[in-house]
């Protein structure tokens, strides 16, 4: 029995390479939005949730996100969406519905494959009402752009922190430099100061000696026979 080997030619290799490189088969980039995922009435959903909050639950927010254009807003929404999901697990049925309504407005961030959060990220405790207000602000910032002028957010997949302030020198104006930076005294400057003070010291000594001599002379005139001090 003869087994026929499949025909293979350079044209087959070229065809396979073209298929692998085809953008249609590779899919869209991560964090890509061809249309705006933000609804026109998202503020109403946030307002309803805020109005029904019986307790201002404590949450945390990142305070040192890098101020990267459009990325910072996306990062803030990504962190807020994690909190909304967590609050849904402990909320009552009515609150769960309101939380889910808000979650649908920011759930689009889950389509982005973000990298693990960096260790440099710092969080502070705040209340859920503050988080909702900030989230609404970030949606307002993204709405005019996302799905329109800006569609590909793949450069935002790595959450970045601001540089540590302890390693940076604060900016200082020339006026501030003139007001705060005084030159340190140097030995040469001290010597110059002593040379300037020396003539004044000699003048004062001479004046004191002359005054003393005049007083002694007057005493000699009043009491003859008392020797006067010799003048240098």
From Swiss-Prot:
Intrachain S-S bonds: 31-112, 71-156, 120-161
Glycosylation sites: 127, 152
Topology relative to the membrane: Single-pass type I membrane protein
GO molecular function: cytokine activity; identical protein binding; receptor tyrosine kinase binding
Origin superkingdom: Eukaryota
Extracellular side: 27-189
Topology, Cytoplasmic side: 211-232
This protein's record includes keyword Transport: no
Entry's Gene Ontology cellular component terms: cell surface; external side of plasma membrane; extracellular region; extracellular space
Keywords assigned: Cell membrane, Cytokine, Disulfide bond, Glycoprotein, Membrane, Secreted, Signal, Transmembrane, Transmembrane helix
SUPFAM superfamilies reported in the protein's UniProt record: 4-helical cytokines (SSF47266)
Signal peptide: 1-26
Location of the protein in the cell: Cell membrane
An individual GO BP term: B cell differentiation
Gene3D superfamilies reported for this sequence: 1.20.1250.10
Function according to Swiss-Prot or TrEMBL: Stimulates the proliferation of early hematopoietic cells by activating FLT3. Synergizes well with a number of other colony stimulating factors and interleukins. Essential for the development of natural killer (NK) cells, B cells, and dendritic cells (DCs).
Assembly mode: Homodimer (soluble isoform).
UniProt name for this protein: Fms-related tyrosine kinase 3 ligand
Gene it is expressed from: Flt3lg
């Amino acid at each position: 029995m003869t087994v026929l080997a499949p025909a293979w030619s350079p044209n087959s290799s070229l065809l396979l390479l073209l298929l692998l490189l085809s953008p249609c088969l590779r899919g869209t980039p991560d964090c890509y939005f061809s249309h705006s995922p933000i609804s026109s009435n998202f503020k109403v959903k946030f307002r309803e949730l805020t109005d029904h909050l019986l307790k201002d639950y404590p949450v945390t927010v990142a305070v040192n996100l890098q101020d990267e254009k459009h990325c910072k807003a996306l990062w803030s929404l990504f962190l807020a969406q994690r909190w909304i999901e967590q609050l849904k697990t402990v909320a009552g049925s009515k609150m769960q519905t309101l939380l889910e309504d808000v979650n649908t407005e920011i759930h689009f961030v889950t389509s982005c494959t973000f990298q693990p959060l960096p260790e440099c990220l710092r969080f502070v405790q705040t209340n859920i009402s503050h988080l909702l207000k900030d989230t609404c602000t970030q949606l307002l910032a993204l709405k005019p752009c996302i799905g329109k002028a800006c569609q590909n957010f793949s450069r935002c997949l790595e959450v970045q922190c601001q540089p540590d302030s302890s390693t940076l020198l604060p900016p200082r104006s020339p006026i501030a430099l003139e007001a705060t930076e005084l030159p340190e005294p140097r030995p040469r400057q001290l010597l110059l100061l002593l040379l300037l003070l020396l003539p004044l010291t000699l003048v004062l000594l001479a004046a004191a000696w002359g005054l003393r001599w005049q007083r002694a002379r007057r005493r000699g005139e009043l009491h003859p026979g008392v020797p006067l001090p010799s003048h240098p």
